[in-house]
Swiss-Prot record:
Keywords: Lyase, Metal-binding. Its EC number is 4.1.3.17, 4.1.1.112. It catalyses: 4-hydroxy-4-methyl-2-oxoglutarate = 2 pyruvate; oxaloacetate + H(+) = pyruvate + CO2. Divalent metal cation. A divalent metal cation binds at D104. This is Putative 4-hydroxy-4-methyl-2-oxoglutarate aldolase. Catalyzes the aldol cleavage of 4-hydroxy-4-methyl-2-oxoglutarate (HMG) into 2 molecules of pyruvate. Also contains a secondary oxaloacetate (OAA) decarboxylase activity due to the common pyruvate enolate transition state formed following C-C bond cleavage in the retro-aldol and decarboxylation reactions.
């Protein structure tokens, strides 16, 4: 028996449901993907101006997963471009949240794939494979914990321990 994916709940509605304890990200990300609402189980990666590890992660099948990428808020180089976003989409990921920059934003904006980032930069990142996977990353006053759940839309980002039912 296949379990269906949890229903998307708008982040503003989640705050109303959860109340004052809602884990809302303070960082103001831009919606740059074609899917402006996305959600899923969190996978994390910390990488500074190097995207080889995150490319490897997005090459893995993860239906409905969301990769949270902590690039230490650097917009000096892009961590995600159209090829890497396409890999994620093709492997079932619902989207990425990039604490850094992306490139190829016009193409990514046409994909049915969620992408929130601080901004854009056409400069490529290095590809040495440095970084850490499945570690707690703290962005915008909240912790993104691997295995927890994230909801993202045009109002912001909410993290919960598990999917919320309406």
């Amino acid at each position: 028996m296949t379990q269906s994916a949890p229903e998307f709940i708008a982040t503003a509605d989640l705050v109303d449901i959860i109340g004052d304890n809602a884990q809302s990200c303070d960082t103001q990300f831009q919606n740059l993907g074609g899917a402006t609402e996305f959600h899923g189980i969190i996978t994390t990666v910390k990488c500074f101006q190097d995207n080889a590890l995150l490319k490897s992660i997005l090459s893995e099948d993860n239906p409905g997963g969301v990769l949270v990428i902590d690039g230490d808020a650097s917009v000096h180089t892009a961590l995600v471009g159209d090829i890497i976003a396409g890999l994620g989409k093709d492997h079932g990921w619902s989207g990425v949240i990039v604490n850094g920059a992306i490139r190829d934003s016009a193409v990514i904006g046409t994909m049915t794939f969620g992408c929130k980032a601080l901004g854009t930069n056409p400069r490529k990142s290095t590809k040495t494979g440095s970084g850490e996977r499945d570690v707690v990353v703290s962005i915008g006053g909240i912790d993104f914990i691997p295995g927890h759940y994230v909801y993202a839309d045009s109002d912001g980002i909410i993290v919960t321990e598990a999917p919320i039912k309406q």
